[in-house]
Amino acid sequence: MNGPRWMLWLSLLAISLGAARPGLGKDAVSRITLKEVLSIGALDDEALFQWTGVAADPDGFIYVLDAMDYSLKKFDPCGALVKKTGRRGQGPGEFMVPRLLDASPNFLFATDQNVAGIYVFDRELNFKKKIPCPALIAHLKALGDDKVAVAAMSFQGPGRILVLNGEGKVLSEIAYLDKDAGVLMDSISFVPDAEGRFYLAYLFQDRIEKWSPDGKRLWSRDLLGGKKTETKKISTFTLPGETCFKDIALDGRGHVFVLGGRLAKAPSRTVFVLNTEGELLTTFTLPDTSHCLYLDRGQFLFARANDGITLKKYRILYD
């Protein structure tokens, strides 16, 4: 075989093998490592007490909900506290159990655990309004300045993701699981992509799913070998115990990041990385346990340390 034909044959073989192997292409990644670039809060300061939700804006400012002092805080890109708002109470912009936080280009969306609604603040932490919600909120993601998606809590109906406008009107919904599955078995974390599709991670089931905007399941995967959470009886309810997954997030490269729960190899530290078709590409381990993952647009990952006293920011390094 002469030189040019040999080179052509090798090129065709490489293309063929590449097409046949999952994970190769623009979403290919064999290893992910983290480099710490910022730490906010420590055992010997009062920057944070017990943070629950985090978000970041395009300018690098970081916003954090702190459950222990009932507040929403804004930090500059270097980690210095810029402003703080909120106090214990049930009035506008006040919290009893601050829990979830997300950001749109111009606004912040926060929840109080036992309030059926969403508090809206501008980026200067000025309270703007409360968006009513037909149910308590288990998870929240901003879809724009005037649109949010929530996982609605219900003991009777099916598990639902509701898309609300800025006045609380339901624009669409996805019923992703029948209530016959059991109490709390519909608990999820979710993240939307730019085309309106939703990626779901079930807290008490070994199940990761992708749904279309019109409510069709596109795929479903397990990552823990089909492990099942143990259940326990409390009064008349049978409740799940240990978590399978804790959170799910998207980067800007076509990767889905899933934080494992208590049933993962490294509990609350193992992160599974999938492509958008649900194929597992790699895993990595967080330095400390975390209750959530947050990825900003600059390809940074935020996670917890010191049982919620510390917020860590890491640069994601792809190999």
What are these regions (language model features)?
Residues 1-9:
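Bacterial N-terminal signal peptides that target proteins for export
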Residues 19-319:
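Eukaryotic scaffold repeat domains enriched in small/polar residues
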Residues 9-18:
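Bacterial N-terminal signal peptides
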